[in-house]
């Protein structure tokens, strides 16, 4: 859905760092990289994050900066603080604090930190991130294991492997974009030996671990990309197209 948002957005809840779980909030590299990648590919200027929700009444300015700096270095450039109550009557006291109003004792001192993120947001929205590596997300493989009636061990294994993979790339300071096959279907092309998605172009495409199937449009573009001299780095060997085994991948 990010591709169709004029300002694509995520939220980042809580104040516990976790860079391992695919469903984590603070520490989830994949979530922010998906956001930034789509903005790079679609040419969007702003990337929004609803931040701080559920961190608790005891969340400090140090926590605020730690959370904000982490997501900004990964590509967020517009913050929406969660949240501002008109009143704390009743259950509102427990509705995912902190609260960014005069109800919080630090409110009168918050301007300095807010000005910092205002300036950082402005600066980070003025440049263009030009990444040369595309990591295709294993969406098709994940959907092939999904069931709304029961849990899937394979689904969790693929998700965890991908989470670990992109986090390892980030810790190794590898700059890359993530590629959604759904967006590739609509925005993908191959031009002059480059794998193109919208306004972004890549000379290297990476297939992550445990990828088993590709969409037909993705496969066709990869074939054309290789014929034009593009580089494909495989950490897995998919053997299915649109979920069906295909001899072209043998």
What is the meaning of each model-derived region?
Residues 1-8, 12-250:
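Carbohydrate-binding surfaces of carbohydrate-active enzymes
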């Amino acid at each position: 859905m990010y591709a169709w948002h004029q300002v694509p957005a995520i939220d980042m809840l809580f104040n516990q760092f976790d860079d391992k779980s695919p469903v984590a909030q603070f520490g989830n590299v994949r979530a922010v990289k998906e956001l930034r990648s789509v903005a790079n590919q679609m040419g969007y200027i702003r990337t929004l994050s609803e931040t701080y929700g559920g961190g608790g009444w005891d969340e400090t300015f140090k926590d605020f900066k730690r959370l904000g700096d982490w997501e900004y270095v990964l590509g967020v450039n517009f913050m929406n603080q969660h949240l501002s109550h008109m009143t704390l009557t009743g259950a509102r006291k427990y509705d995912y604090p902190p609260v960014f109003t005069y109800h919080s004792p630090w409110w009168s001192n918050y301007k300095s930190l807010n000005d910092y993120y205002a300036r950082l947001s402005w600066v980070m929205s003025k440049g263009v991130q030009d990444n040369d590596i595309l990591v295709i997300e294993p969406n098709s493989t994940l959907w092939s294991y999904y069931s709304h009636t029961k849990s899937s061990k394979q689904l969790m294994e693929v998700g965890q492997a991908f989470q670990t993979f992109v986090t390892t790339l980030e810790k190794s300071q590898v700059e890359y974009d993530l590629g959604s096959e759904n967006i590739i279907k609509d925005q993908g092309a191959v031009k002059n030996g480059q794998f193109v998605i919208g306004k972004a172009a890549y000379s290297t495409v990476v297939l992550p671990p445990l990828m088993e199937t590709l969409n037909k449009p993705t496969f066709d573009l990869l074939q054309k990309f290789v014929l034009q001299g593009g580089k494909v780095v495989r950490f897995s060997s998919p053997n299915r197209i649109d979920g069906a085994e295909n001899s072209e991948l043998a």
